[in-house]
C-alpha cells in the first residue's frame, strides 16, 4: 500500500562503473525518529561478489541507539530502468530492525550482467538510479538521535513545534503567510512534529533555488516529500502550485537546451556539406 511508505528517496550513483570502493553509502535521511541510509556493493557482497549488485537499508549511527530500540519497517528498493520504468527491478521487504540487527536487504538485487548492459537501461550516461521507499509500521523504545540534536541546541516553541534559533525567522514567516498550514495536522509526538517541520523547511528552501540547479531526482524527491506532508495534514496547495511552476520552468529550460543542441548539430552538418562541396 502506498500510504505505508512515509518517505521516498532517489539515490543516483555517478560513474557507477568506475566506483572502486567495495561498499558505498547514500546520504543519510530521516524516517520517523531515526536516521537511515542505503548501502550498495557495486560489485556484489559475499557469495554474490562479481555476480550481482547488493543493496541494503541500514540504521545510521546504530552504535548510539539505546538498548531496547527496535523498529518494524516496510521498505521497497528499486533499481530504476531509465528507459522504461516497467522494466525496473524492485524488491519489497518487511521486518524488525534492532540495535544489533541494523541492516537488511538483498545480496542479489540485480545481476551485474544486466545492470552493466549498455542497452539495458539501468546504466545511462554512467549513472545508476536507486529509489527507496520506507515506512515505519511499529515503534518500540525511543531514539536518542533527534532528541540529542534538540538538546544540543536551545529550542523555541512556535505553535507547538520545537524550533532551533536559526529557524525562528523562517518558521514565523511561514505561519504568518499561511496561518492555516497546520490546521489539520494532528500528530502530538514532538519528534515527529519536528521531523515534518524540518522536511517542510527544506522543501521551501529547495523551491527558492534556481530551477537550473534542480535535477530530475531533486524534483522527484520534492514531489514525494510534498505528498507525505499533505498526507500528514499540512495544507500546502500554495507550495504544490510553486513546485509545479518550478518543474514547468525546468522542462522549458531543458527544451531550450535541446533546441540549442539541435541547431548546433544542424550547423555542423551544414558546414561539413560546404567543406565537401569545395573539394
UniProtKB/Swiss-Prot annotation:
CDD domains to which the protein is assigned, alphabetical: MATH
Keyword annotations: Coiled coil
Coiled-coil positions: 235-271
Residue ranges constituting the MATH domain according to the UniProt record: 6-134
Name this polypeptide is given: MATH domain and coiled-coil domain-containing protein At1g31390
Source organism per UniProt: Arabidopsis thaliana (Mouse-ear cress)
Record-linked Gene3D superfamilies: Apoptosis, Tumor Necrosis Factor Receptor Associated Protein 2, Chain A
Cited SUPFAM superfamilies: TRAF domain-like
